[in-house]
Each structure stands twice: as structure tokens, then as C-alpha cells.
Amino acid sequence: MSEEEQTNGSLSIRKPSRMPKCSRCRNHGFVSPLKGHKRFCNWRDCQCQKCRLIAERQRVMAAQVALRRQQAQEEEMGICSPINLSGSDTLVKNEAVGENVFTLSSGPPSPASSSATASPTNLGSRSMLSLSPAMSSRGHTDCTSDLMVDASYYNLYQPTPYSSYYSNLYNYQQYQMPSGNGRLSSHNVSPQYRTHSYYSSYLSQGLGAACVQPSTCPEPKAAAFSDGAQDSVSISSMINAENKLECESSSESGSFSVDSIIEGATK
């Protein structure tokens, strides 16, 4: 017992307390404790090969620490949870998985080939076949991911199953042009509220001069806009000529009567 106690005491004496040392100073042959030394290091801006390797290693370690911290925060928020994947699963790619699926589903393998083909690729393909439904449900395309997305978080990016029902919710019907009788095909209007049919005939025949009438001739205008205004252009021109003659005669007779009345009053 005494010898064991002595050996334990000697080991405790030999093993000093671990204090980190400056790696840049060690590269140049100096030993200096790291605590409070980073600001005053003489080789903090050294660009030698060893110091560049040390700087690269420090950047990689800092990135790993930041990634672990981010994963821990996501786990606390419930966004994702880590899963354990084997090495063969992480090495198999999706293209190889698709080829192995077709080869396995094409036909039953022969006994010789089944006994001879026990390769890690086939093992990886089998494991990936077992994982393929879960990965297809999550929508992942890369099997090297070590995070499994939560269902509530992933549903934000899934299309809604009622898209076909709600897609036409606010799609109104297009405006329908009026038919020959001036009504829409989906409306049944009483005869007293029906519009006249001269709009379609007027627009199709181009009777632009029929609506330009003097204010002293209301009868030709009513005749031009009646329901029987679907005549030819020659008839409308004849009506316009007659209207002009009647208007001129009425204006002349009106002026003569006015002049005669004025002359009689002066006499």
C-alpha cells in the first residue's frame, strides 16, 4: 500500500497544472503563457508557414464553435433536432441510390452475385433505401445533412392541400359582350328595361353621320334611332337629304312669318 501511495504521489508531483502557451512564440523558440499575451505577442502578425497554419486552424475552430452554438440555439427553439447517421449513409450520394434502386427492383439477383456482392456501396444503398421515405417526406436532396427539420417548421414551405379549392376564390368571370338583343346571356330583363338594338347595328355599319343632327329636327333623329335602323347606308343618306330640305324650308317659313309680324307692327 505504501508503494502505491508513493507512486500516486510521484505522479501528482510530476504532472504540472496545464497552462496554455502561445503557439506563435513556440514556433520561434519562446515559451510564454497565453493568458494576457495575445495583445503583446511579438509574432502576432508573422506570415511564416507555421504561423499561417496556426491562423488557419484558429479560423476553422472558431467556425466550428459558432456552428455548434447555432445548432444549440436551434434545438432550444425547437426548430430542428439532431439525428445520428452512420458513416456509410453519409458517403452514399443520391445518384448512386437511384441506380441501385433500379438494379434491385429490376429482378431477383442470382445466388452467385448475391454472395459475391457484399460491398459497402450496396450496404449504403440498402440503408439509404430504408431512409428514402423519411427523406422524401422532409424534402431533402442531400443525404449528408445531420439535422432533421421539425414538422411544424417544414409545413411553412409545403403547398396547401386546398390550393385547388382556394385558387378560384376571387377569380371573377370575365365581362361578356352584349348579344344581338342588347342583353347579357346570364340576365333576364323585363321588356320595359331592355336596351335598344341600334347599338350593335350602329357600331357595325359605321353610321357616324346619323347621330349628328341639328337641334331643330327631332323627328329625323327619332327615326334614325328607331328599332328599324338596320337599313343600308343609301337609305340613311336619303333620309339625311330630306331632313336638310325640311329644315331649310321650316327656317325660311319661320323667318318670313317673323318679318311679316314685325312689318305689321310697324305699320
Swiss-Prot record:
Protein name (Swiss-Prot/TrEMBL): Doublesex- and mab-3-related transcription factor 1
Stretches for region Disordered: 102-137, 246-267
GO cellular component assignments: nucleus
Described function: Transcription factor that plays a key role in sex determination and differentiation by controlling gonad development and germ cell proliferation. Acts both as a transcription repressor and activator.
Localization of this protein: Nucleus
Polar residues: compositionally biased ranges: 122-135
Chain intervals with Low complexity compositional bias: 112-121, 248-260
Xref: Pfam families: DM (PF00751), Dmrt1 (PF12374)
Source species, domain of life: Eukaryota
Tissue expr: Expressed in developing germ cells of both testis and ovary.
SMART domains to which the protein is assigned, alphabetical: DM
UniProt keyword Cell inner membrane, yes or no: no
A single GO BP: regulation of transcription by RNA polymerase II
Primary gene name: dmrt1
Organism name: Danio rerio (Zebrafish)
GO MF annotation list: DNA-binding transcription factor activity, RNA polymerase II-specific; metal ion binding; RNA polymerase II cis-regulatory region sequence-specific DNA binding
Keyword vocabulary terms for this entry: Activator, Developmental protein, Differentiation, DNA-binding, Metal-binding, Nucleus, Repressor, Sexual differentiation, Transcription, Transcription regulation, Zinc
DNA-binding region: 22-69
